[in-house]
Amino acid sequence: MAASRAPRRRLEDLSVDEFLASGFESGSESELEGAAEERRARGAAWNRERRGARTSPGPAGRLRKGRASEHKDQLSRLKDRDPEFYKFLQENDRSLLDFSDSDSSAEEEEPFHSLPDTLEEASETEEDGGEDSDALPRGLRSKKNEPVPVTLAMVERWRQGSRHHLTPRLFHEVVQAFRAAVATTQGEQEAAETCRFQVADSAVFNALVTFCIRDLCGCLQKLLFGKTPKDSNRLLLPSSSPLWGKLRVDVKSYLSAVVQLAACLAEATVSAAVLQHISSLVPYFLTFPKQCRMLLKRMVVLWSTGEESLRVLAFLVLIRVCRHKKEAFLGPILKQMYIMYVRNCKFTSPSTLPLISFMQRTLTEMLALDPSVSYQHAFLYIRQLAVHLRNAMTTGKKETHQSVYNWQYVHCLYLWCRVLSTLGSSEILQPLLYPLSQIIIGCIKLLPTARFYPLRMHCVRALTLLSQTIGTFIPVLPFILEIFQQVDFNRRPGRMSSKPINFSVILKLSSTNLQEKAYRDGLLEQLCDLILEYLHSQAHSIAFPELVLPTVLQLKSFLRECKVANYCRQVRQLLEKVQENARHIESLRQSATFSVSDRTAVDAWEKQVREEGTPLTRYYGHWKKLRDREIQLEISGKERLEDLNFPEIKRRKVEDRKDEDRKELKDLFELDSSEGEDSTDFFERGVPRLPEAHQGLKEDQEEEDKEEGDSDSEDGDTDTGVDLSELWQLAQGAQDELEDLQLSEED
């Protein structure tokens, strides 16, 4: 110990043996250590002086300074007493040795907090995060920016809380969870990660969406307005509620999420439930113009392309929004709906025709909301139709003709005829009647050939619809009667057709169709229907006898020239009803006491006749019922045919089929005596008796011959078929007769 504590000599005073025994400790190292100790001592003294200047002198300050210096002295004594242990502490626990007075003062002063010089303002996201973290129940708070998984228990708790008493904080939680559920359906991973909640289970998704669709709107309405108002038809804007300021942001987020959900659903039943929920949320959408435009855009798409029930619900939402916000939304929505209508009318078939008719009627109802706005759109689009027709008439090219003779053009004519017939009483739209009727007449006269008779019939129906409701005379009958003069109904058809022609879904006939018998059958039926429909609208007119005179003459001329019994029967029945109605009007006119120039008296007389009814109107009502029933049966028959499960034909293997065929042939050639006895009954009374299969064939042949005979008689042909028994007799030949030869006297 004495040797260790003795002062160390310098290197130059040591011998070689002493230097090697000293453990390679140089004097420079000891000098460096001494200098380091001096620096630490000066630093500690400076820190003590600084702390003494900061803090007021007192017993607590002196106590802290004494503890620090005492601990430091203990470490220095440990270094002298046990240098090996001190070295061990340096290598393994350096923090214990690097102790200064500042550390002790920092620990003692830690409970005290000093404010920074500048304060930062909190952002909206931080505020939301703080509110959300406070609103979450204990045990569900997770790490920062980590979404909370939604469970069925949470959804049930939200449902019970909303039914009992909905609060703004609870509504905020439900909206955040609903947004997370919608984000998962759209596949937006970034949006789902930014949400506060996470919906990963399909059962939780269904429960949450069902709760929001069924219960949330009613609870929100109760929270805003309390009791339901007595006048349920009156629209209550949620902005009038005193709580609207607290709920406005959450309601806006919820409406955006609902529109996104309606856009991504594929199941018709679920989409229908969401659309019904949207219909109840219309007052909230009216408060936010941006969300309302998003909603209307989506509803127009569903109205034009969705399933039938979805189309109806989407239209109800559209008309409800436009009824309350005509100035803001009616004009753009009418334009968008017309564009979608034209786009969906490009092709027409029996399956798409009801949907096109639905779009016509609903678009007409939208145009009826404001006649002044409707006039602007009607004038623009009717003028566009007139420009297409003028180009086709002036150039005469095939391309320009195709721009007129297509389904889109024809359905647009139908639409505006329906609109003007519905709003014809409005003085704003009356100036458009004459241009529209002239466009339709020009469309008929563009190519007046037999191939475009179906298109002519569509135009005639549009003119009839226009003339029925507005009370304006339009010369429709000449375009119908002209066909009787152009078509030869007595001409024998070039080929037989397998099915009738549906004139309601075609615009043009092919050259093959013009040679078929079904073409003339369907054409005559369509002509009789068109005459009946137009004359039904004029049956109460005081000038009906004079109006139908050209028609009566043309029908009588047809009956004199036509030789087909079926055609004559249809025309004769129509002619009788027209003449009966003319005689009825003449008998009523004889008892009239007013002059024909008295317009008021004439209108009153025609109104009375319409209310009482005429023979032609009663016949038309009965005919219309039968025709609608035929159409329904045809549609239902097609549906049954589609749903019918035809039996499968199970083909046998080649080996099995050969074995069975050999067995059948073997049994066939093994003749018994009974078969020989039965074969004697083949001839009876000198006339061959046919087997049962041949007898059935004979009956079928007789029925076919009978049908062919009827059809030939209708076409003016008198040829008859040959019976199978007659063919058999002809093959047998007549019995030979022996006659005496008579020789003349000259031989």
UniProtKB/Swiss-Prot annotation:
Residues 36-52, 67-84, 682-699 have a biased composition (Basic and acidic residues). Ubiquitous. Keywords: Apoptosis, Nucleus, Phosphoprotein, Repressor, Transcription, Transcription regulation. Its main location: nucleus. GO terms for molecular function: histone binding; p53 binding. GO terms for cellular component: nucleolus; nucleoplasm; nucleosome; nucleus. Transmembrane segments: none annotated. Residues 100-110, 118-134, 670-681, 700-720, 736-747 have a biased composition (Acidic residues). SUPFAM superfamilies: ARM repeat. It is found in: Nucleus, Nucleoplasm; Nucleus, Nucleolus. GO terms for biological process: apoptotic process; negative regulation of transcription by RNA polymerase II. Residues 23-84, 98-145, 669-747 are annotated as: Disordered. The modification Phosphoserine is found at residues 95, 673-674, 744. Interacts with p53/TP53. Interacts (via the N- and C-terminus domains) with AURKB (via the middle kinase domain). Interacts with TP63 (via activation domain). Interacts with histone H3 (via N-terminus and non-acetylated form preferentially). Associates with core histones and nucleosomes. Acts as an inhibitor of histone acetyltransferase activity; prevents acetylation of all core histones by the EP300/p300 histone acetyltransferase at p53/TP53-regulated target promoters in a histone deacetylases (HDAC)-independent manner. Acts as a transcription corepressor of p53/TP53- and TP63-mediated transactivation of the p21/CDKN1A promoter. Involved in the regulation of p53/TP53-dependent apoptosis. Belongs to the NOC2 family. This is Nucleolar complex protein 2 homolog. It comes from Mus musculus.
